[in-house]
């Protein structure tokens, strides 16, 4: 099942304290056929250096240094240069389980879904990360029905955030993240959902969202 190239895009801005841990969680993925795109969005700390050092150690890593343009712009740049059949967007202060890509890709292939979504857990520094042992089958739902459930508050952790998902690359042919817009995830993800006939929902926490005072959105 490990034949298609998958692009993992990390938008990066001043996250030197967390970046190594995030990159390590990506390069250790059980699914190995990855293109890892690190988009340094004009960082003023050691993040650019960390990106370059990891690129020397892993040939799958591509680094882009650009002027600061915000989270949406960094994501768009990464998507534009990506070559994978599927795309995952990982915030550079978060972590992903070792099987994150493999399990979501398997959901897409088995159900012919254009997007696969997993549950997520929040954590703070020092917290123990626990990966769910849930081995249940993914729920298959239409994009339109999922949007309806989200707006009705019935979707749980399968919402409009960008980062706990695997997307078919084709979806971004006509959709971009809006420059300078607040809640850019919501503005974009609902469009991606509506353009997807089928979405796979995996009720298993494979993405770990770090809670910290400052964030990549600042």
Indicate where each model-derived feature is located.
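Nucleotide-sugar donor-binding/catalytic module of glycosyltransferases
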Residues: 1-218
């Amino acid at each position: 099942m490990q034949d298609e190239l998958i692009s993992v895009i990390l938008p990066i801005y001043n996250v030197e304290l967390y970046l190594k841990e995030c990159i390590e969680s990506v390069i250790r993925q059980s699914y190995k056929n990855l293109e890892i795109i690190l988009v340094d969005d004009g960082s003023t700390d050691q993040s650019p250096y960390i990106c370059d050092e990891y690129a020397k150690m892993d040939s799958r890593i591509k680094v882009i240094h650009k002027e600061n343009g915000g989270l949406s712009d960094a994501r768009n740049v990464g998507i534009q240069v990506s070559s994978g059949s599927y795309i995952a967007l990982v915030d550079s202060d978060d972590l992903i389980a070792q099987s994150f890509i493999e399990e979501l890709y398997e959901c897409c292939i088995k159900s012919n879904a254009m997007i696969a979504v997993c549950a997520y857990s929040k954590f703070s520094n020092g917290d123990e990360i626990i990966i769910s042992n849930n081995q249940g089958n993914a729920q298959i739902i239409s994009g339109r029905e999922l949007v309806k459930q989200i707006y009705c508050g019935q979707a749980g952790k399968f919402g409009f955030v960008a980062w706990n998902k695997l997307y078919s690359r084709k979806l971004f042919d006509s959709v971009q993240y809006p420059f300078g817009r607040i809640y850019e995830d919501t503005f974009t993800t609902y469009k991606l959902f509506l353009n997807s006939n089928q979405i796979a929902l995996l009720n298993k926490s494979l993405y770990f969202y770090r809670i910290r005072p400052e964030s990549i959105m600042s």
